[in-house]
């Protein structure tokens, strides 16, 4: 549910927070992790993934033109939850620590959401994750860095093997951003197909793109078309808002032929224009609802459930019984191998996209399922999703 809905009719206790997501090359992950520990950030999750860029090289034997292929690089995706008034200070600290203002170092963004946490333990002790000290960044603003405001996150959850690489190629050809690809396991439509389920593999590729908000729907329509998402079982795509962020603009790897790279020029213009509106290209696609096959349902919600490893199935079943169409579950881990309660830090995160009309019912079902055990669910996060698409809609 949205912030307004939660305030008007809250079924359980909640708090408004910011989710900061940062993906960097795996060689930077240790340094960034140490800094997050120093900051005192709570609920930090790490997920392995890969970034995709274009590698351009001259053709051999002096032939004209260039050879272009995709280059994968290992990455770590950090997710931290902080108070909303601390979010930008933490982001600037992370940017300065990992030098994310330099092209090729990584991407960072924050999203505003409503968080439901599990209640206090039955023995009367408080939940340490709720009483953790506030984050205390030492840098309130990275020098020469201006966060972009007009951004959106596009999440594509794909069923077919190799489709993640295909959509990453499309995103790079469009010059949107550096795609980040992670893995997950799907539950929902496939389980209802009977014998036809063998045609839809359970493993999913999750492609995430941080793009200018002005072009988000136009890019979504192109991805739907290129990924054949109008066919059943191929996957789905949805959009969520980004409050602030900094995008990695190094889409291509190759020899630099000029005094400044195109990535440096784009970053400089973004700073001068104080946003990405000047990049808008898909003027006629954003509001095009004439093609019924590509109609984007409005007013949706993304529900994320973070739980102890092995417990996601119970929660997903409760969500499906409450009306959710399915879920995608990924394996993540806490920042340390043992969390502050002495439990193993392995976690599962299930992502569920639902219409706003049933969001409250699904959240209530999840909280009810988690009530039977103190350690089944760490928290539930609810985020607005202004546009979504799946074949079943």
Protein language model regions, located:
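Positively charged, small/polar-rich N-terminal and surface patches that mediate targeting and assembly
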Residues: 2-393
């Amino acid at each position: 549910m949205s912030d307004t809905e939660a305030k008007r009719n809250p079924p359980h206790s909640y708090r408004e927070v910011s989710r900061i997501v940062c993906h960097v090359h795996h060689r930077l992950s240790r340094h960034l992790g140490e800094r997050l520990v120093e900051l005192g950030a709570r609920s930090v999750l790490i997920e392995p993934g890969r970034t995709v860029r274009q590698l351009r090289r001259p053709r051999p034997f002096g032939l004209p033109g260039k050879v272009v292929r995709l280059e994968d690089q290992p990455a770590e995706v950090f997710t931290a939850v902080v108070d909303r008034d601390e979010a930008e200070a933490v982001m600037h600290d992370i940017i300065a620590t990992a030098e994310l203002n330099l092209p090729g170092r990584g991407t960072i963004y924050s999203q505003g959401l409503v968080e439901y946490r599990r209640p206090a333990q039955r023995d009367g002790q408080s939940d340490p994750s709720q009483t953790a000290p506030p984050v205390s960044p030492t840098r309130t603003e990275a020098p020469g860095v201006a966060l972009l405001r007009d951004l959106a996150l596009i999440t594509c959850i794909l069923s077919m093997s190799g489709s993640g690489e295909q959509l990453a190629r499309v995103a790079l050809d469009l010059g949107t951003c550096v795609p980040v690809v992670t893995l997950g396991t799907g539950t929902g439509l496939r389980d209802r197909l009977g014998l036809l389920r063998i045609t839809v593999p359970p493993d999913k590729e999750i492609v995430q793109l941080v793009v200018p908000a002005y072009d988000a729907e136009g890019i979504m329509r192109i991805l739907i078309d290129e990924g054949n998402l109008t066919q059943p079982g191929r996957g789905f795509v949805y959009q969520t808002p980004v409050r602030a962020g900094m995008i990695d603009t190094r889409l291509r790897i190759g020899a630099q032929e000029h005094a400044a790279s195109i990535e440096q020029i784009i970053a400089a213009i973004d700073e001068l224009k104080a946003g990405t509106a000047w990049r808008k290209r898909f003027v006629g696609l954003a509001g095009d609802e004439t093609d019924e096959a590509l109609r984007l349902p409005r007013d949706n919600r993304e529900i994320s459930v973070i739980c102890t490893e092995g417990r996601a199935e119970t929660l997903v079943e409760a969500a499906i019984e409450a009306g959710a169409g399915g879920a995608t579950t990924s394996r993540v881990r806490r920042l340390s191998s043992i969390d502050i309660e002495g439990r193993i830090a392995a976690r599962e995160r299930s992502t569920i996209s639902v219409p706003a009309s049933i969001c409250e019912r699904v959240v209530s079902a999840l909280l009810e399922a988690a009530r039977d055990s103190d350690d089944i669910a760490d928290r539930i996060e609810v985020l607005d999703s202004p546009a979504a698409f799946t074949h079943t809609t």
